[in-house]
Regions:
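Carbohydrate-active enzyme catalytic cores, enriched for enzymes
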Residues: 1-145, 198
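CBM-like, beta-strand-rich accessory domains located in the C-terminal region of large
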Residues: 24-25, 32-37, 49-69, 154-329
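Short, glycine/acidic-enriched loop or turn micro-motifs at the edges of active sites
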Residues: 123, 151, 238
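Catalytic Cys-His active-site segments of thiol-dependent hydrolases/isopeptidases
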Residues: 146-150
Length: 329
């Protein structure tokens, strides 16, 4: 049987130093080599990320002795066991496949060009919470084309009633629809009520509850083409007539609007974004964000209005949206 710790470790490291993190986590962080070695001593299918991204001796800015000690001890024990044929040689990360971590309501799909999409359900009352139910990240070759910002600078306000006035903790700093110009709400009751992975590699999320009373239904379907790395996200939203719906995506990378598409430029690749069900122009807004180290970052928010149909004599408005991204060289 696969233990929960083993399963999480197997799936949470993506490629090129990227790992699955939400809320106050950092997807660009290093990984604990000691823990990886400890698990590899016990389980034969543990995979090792590139050692370039292993946490160094000085990787913990707080210099916590117990973590440093076990990191050193478990690594040396594993290397001795490999040399003495008591443990298997390290194996690299897998570059394809899919996995759902149902208790956490996280899902990971991997595809060509080292692409990965990571989606979450959960609720807005989690530890170190951000209002991010239904959000996702899109990575290619170690670059985050649609990102999760992780923790901001820890200040007094960050852990007060002003927490959700800070950009990185709000829904608008995540890849989720904005409905009625209001944020998702904080609290455990604001949650996903459906989160599943189909045999066809579709992630299905229902998360109207995260918005409170503004939305009657919010369905999201996410699909990653394993052979090409193309990402497709379809949103179906029912709300009160007259309520405006906006798609909202965030990235740290440079963005431009070209030929009715959005181009997100990474160091190795570009991502081309097309949107169906769009009303009006793409709007690109740059927001200043103090990251966990207190360093100022410019975050590009990509937003557009979604066409909303209001059937005659109906008490609901219906918004359908389709987002497609593909990676170019």
């Amino acid at each position: 049987a696969v233990s929960p710790v083993q399963e999480l470790h197997l799936q949470s490291n993506i490629a090129a130093g990227r790992a699955i993190r939400f809320s106050d986590g950092d997807s660009r962080g290093t990984y604990p080599m000691g823990l990886t070695c400890c698990l590899a001593d016990q389980y034969s299918d543990i995979r090792f990320p590139d050692t370039l991204y292993a946490q160094k001796l000085d990787g913990d800015s707080c210099w916590r002795w117990i973590g440093i000690y076990w990191n050193w001890y478990w690594t040396h024990r594993y290397l001795d066991d490999v040399q003495n044929k008591k443990a298997e040689e390290p194996k690299p990360l897998e570059q394809s496949g899919m996995c759902i971590l149902q208790d956490a309501q996280w899902c990971i799909l991997r595809g060509a060009k080292q692409t990965a999409v990571i989606a979450k359900g959960g609720n807005n009352g989690e530890s170190h919470n951000h209002n991010d139910v239904g959000s996702f990240q899109y990575l290619a070759d170690g670059e985050a084309f649609l990102d999760d910002l992780g923790a901001g600078e820890y200040t007094k306000d960050y852990f007060s009633e002003k927490r959700y006035e800070i950009f990185c903790n709000r829904g608008e700093s995540h890849n989720i629809p904005i409905i009625g110009d209001v944020d998702q709400k904080a609290g455990k009751e604001y949650c996903a009520d459906r989160f599943e992975l189909t045999k066809d590699r579709n992630i299905l999320i229902s998360f109207a509850k995260a918005y409170g009373i503004e939305a009657q239904k919010v369905y999201r379907e996410i699909w990653l083409d394993e052979n090409t790395g193309k990402l497709t996200v379809c949103d179906y939203i029912q709300c009160r007539p007259g309520v405006e719906v906006h798609e909202n995506l965030v990235t740290r990378l440079p963005v431009s609007v070209e030929n009715d598409s959005v181009v997100i430029r990474g160091e190795k690749h570009c991502a081309i974004l097309h949107a169906e069900g769009r009303k009006g122009e793409f709007k690109i807004k740059t927001v200043e964000h103090l990251n966990h180290q207190g360093i100022l970052e410019n975050i590009n928010v990509i937003r557009w209005d979604v066409c909303c149909d209001e059937p005659q004599n109906s008490k609901i408005g219906i918004a359908d949206s389709k987002i497609c991204l593909h990676i170019t060289e």
